[in-house]
Amino acid sequence: MAHKKGQGASRNGRDSKSKRLGVKVGAGQKVSTGSILVRQRGTRWNPAQNVGRGRDDTLFALVDGIVVMKKTNRTYISVVPEQL
């Protein structure tokens, strides 16, 4: 015979891993081709000159240069090539 009553399992104890979203490179910083600038869900930041957008809306640099952020009705991120 059991000496303890049966205990129900807890329904807690689950959590999802963080996705590490956000801006990875600030304005004025140097970047190389292929560098990830922003990881996002949706288009909170939009690609401008010399910036590509991946299928998961990640923004990345298409050329070596310096990051520029511009805010009008939307926030745009571009990369200005460095002058030699």
UniProtKB/Swiss-Prot annotation:
Listed Pfam families: Ribosomal_L27
Gene3D superfamilies: 2.40.50.100
InterPro entries hit by this protein: Ribosomal_bL27 (IPR001684)
Stretches for region Disordered: 1-27
Biological processes annotated in GO: translation
Keywords attached to this entry: Ribonucleoprotein, Ribosomal protein
Molecular function in Gene Ontology: structural constituent of ribosome
Keyword set includes Ribonucleoprotein: yes
Gene Ontology cellular-component annotations: cytosolic large ribosomal subunit
Family designation: Belongs to the bacterial ribosomal protein bL27 family.
PANTHER family: LARGE RIBOSOMAL SUBUNIT PROTEIN BL27M, RIBOSOMAL PROTEIN L27
Annotated protein name in UniProt: Large ribosomal subunit protein bL27
Organism: Chlamydia pneumoniae
